């Protein structure tokens, strides 16, 4: 996952100047179990304010590669191979008009469009602030992050 995150407070004196009060990425399932998560003050940000999050099996060489690259690592702890990645940001400065407001992304209508993933791609509504992901094999990841750096920095 890769996304630009709004600024968040490092302490209570920054509440008024930060773009959001809190943001997090959580890994869960369809019955709302939360298996793991990372929140804003834990993020490793790159020089452009982006967070790159590697979600993979807890294998030392996978974690180490992410850490050496300066990426965040979250172990895949869900049973099976399906899960939900939930991105949250709370109390947005600027409200619904802020470029990073999740309120800009409409709720999907499951009655008329069961596969709402394309029509409701958050990137259409909040641009670089939307999480973007790329699935790859272990070998692809170990060789060059599955081409991740090229695909998301174009």
Model-derived features: where do they sit?
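A compositional/structural signature for long, glycine/proline-rich flexible linkers
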Residues: 1-154
């Amino acid at each position: 996952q890769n996304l630009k995150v709004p600024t968040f407070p490092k302490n209570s004196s920054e509440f008024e100047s930060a773009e959001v009060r809190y943001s997090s990425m959580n890994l869960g399932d369809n019955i709302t179990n939360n298996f793991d998560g990372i929140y804003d003050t834990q993020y490793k940000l790159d020089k452009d304010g982006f967070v790159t999050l590697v979600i993979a099996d807890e294998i030392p060489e996978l974690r180490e590669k992410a850490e050496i690259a300066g990426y965040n690592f979250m172990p895949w702890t869900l049973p099976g191979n399906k899960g939900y990645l939930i991105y949250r940001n709370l109390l947005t400065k600027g409200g619904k008009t802020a470029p990073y407001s999740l309120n800009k992304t409409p709720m999907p209508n499951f009655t008329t469009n069961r596969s709402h993933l394309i029509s409701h791609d958050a990137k259409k509504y909040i641009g670089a602030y939307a999480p973007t992901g790329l699935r790859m094999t272990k070998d692809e990841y170990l060789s060059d992050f599955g081409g991740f750096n090229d695909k998301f920095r174009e």
